[in-house]
């Protein structure tokens, strides 16, 4: 799995109570995405909206924890959603 997608999957594990999150995680497990661009292209509007919301929080959390590597990797996906 792409490193960036690995960070994303780990972040999503904090939100598995949400149905959209569960759907995204199932996609990640069912398909082997070569990179984050390929993954984002496969998302529907609801999934993109959910990720946009979650990634804002997860990136801020990573920055507050001074985990710049994590913040950078998550930001790569976030930028593709915009």
UniProtKB/Swiss-Prot annotation:
Keywords: Sporulation. Induction: Expression is regulated by the sporulation transcription factor sigma G. InterPro entries: CsgA. It comes from the Bacteria. GO terms for biological process: sporulation resulting in formation of a cellular spore. This is Sigma-G-dependent sporulation-specific SASP protein. The gene is csgA.
């Amino acid at each position: 799995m792409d490193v960036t997608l690995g960070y994303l999957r780990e972040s999503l594990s904090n939100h598995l109570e949400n149905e959209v999150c569960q759907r995204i995680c199932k996609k990640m497990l069912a398909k082997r995405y070569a990179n984050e661009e390929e993954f984002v292209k496969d998302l529907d509007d609801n999934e993109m909206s959910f990720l946009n919301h979650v990634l804002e929080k997860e990136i801020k959390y990573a920055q507050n924890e001074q985990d710049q590597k994590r913040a950078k990797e998550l930001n790569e996906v976030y930028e593709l959603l915009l």
